[in-house]
Amino acid sequence: MPNWCWTSYVAVGDKKDIRDLYKKMKSLENSEKSLIENGFGNTWLGNLVTILGGDYHKISCRGEFGNLSINHNYTVVRFDTMTAWGEFDDLRKFIQFKYPSVFIYYRSEEPGMGYYGTNDVNSEYLPRIKVEEGYQESYYYSNWEEVFQFLSEKIGTEIHSME
């Protein structure tokens, strides 16, 4: 049994690519039957790889997607995944390969192993920063100024930047 990793994705790109990605993912959500038999159902990541023309045997697919949405001008798709152990970068890179105009930002967390990762270092699309204090204490902040204030209070010295 794996530790489950929760990842939020924001795909940004031109309208044609974003709309096509969204329509394909939405068709999987709305389908009465899974493309391929699996233990996750219609939103299994292997179905997503398959509908995009890939081979689910070659790309990590142990998980599912949900919370699919698109912005009003069709340039941003958001979705979340639950996957085994960590963020599936090969899946993310495969989607970006299929849609050359698309870049996918992610933020992932697998608390069992203390894994936290993101490629949105400026918190432009996924504004949530995690600070861990000890083994069980975690705090989430929307921006670095809040993190600096928290750390300043903890150590008794003013912090204003990462330098």
Model-found features: residue ranges?
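Intrinsic low-complexity, intrinsically disordered or marginally ordered coil/linker segments
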Residues: M1-E163
